[in-house]
Amino acid sequence: MSQRLTTALVTGASAGLGAEFCRQLAPLCDRIVAVARRADRLQSLVSDLAQQAEVVPLVADLNGVEGVARCMEAIRQRGPLDYLVNNAGFGTFGHFIEQSIDSQRDMVSLHVDAAITLCRAAIPFMREQGGGHIINVSSLGAFLPGRGPAVCGATKAFLNHFSLALQQELVGTGIEVQALCPGYIRTEFHEDMAAAGFDPSRIPDEMWMEASEVVSASLAALGSGRALVVPGARNAELAREGLAEQLAALN
């Protein structure tokens, strides 16, 4: 009987947090299914991590049913997942009324629909094997309505609520669910937002983190039972302030 391989599936794996998750999971895994739209970036990841883990590139656009279906099939074919990282996403800049409705619907599809569908596909296998880890990449913006794009923050707030609820539902199964809520990260994500009008120079230097720091904080928190992880002391303070403002609105 062949030995079961430790396997991870990471979406949005071609750059930024996704690529960094692949790098830091490589020493922990035998195989990583890396999902993204850019085939050339995935091939670079295959080469970079060849000495540590088998990286299986899966070119798919999770904004559509076909791309999500390809991921679900990969989960079935590659066996139980030990790690599922729902990281694929994009940001916009500006008020809701200034954005096209198509881009906002695409954001909901990618951030919410794709994440819950892949969780639904992975959990039965994880439960059967006695455990696993699900990391849903959320955002500090989930705690701060009104301080960022409305739909983006709302989708991330959904992921927080979903992750907390799922963690409760899965008590006793060995499956751990985490919503990772980073603030500003030096990645292409914020570079793309800068092209849309976001001014990164307005953000104090101490608010920025490296992708490696964020991923390290996420993986270090596994096993702690913490369903919400906010890397960075200042970010955690802002999250608490945002929650306090929401509670105050009830009065």
What are these model-derived regions, one by one?
Residues A179, D199-L238:
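C-terminal helical subdomain
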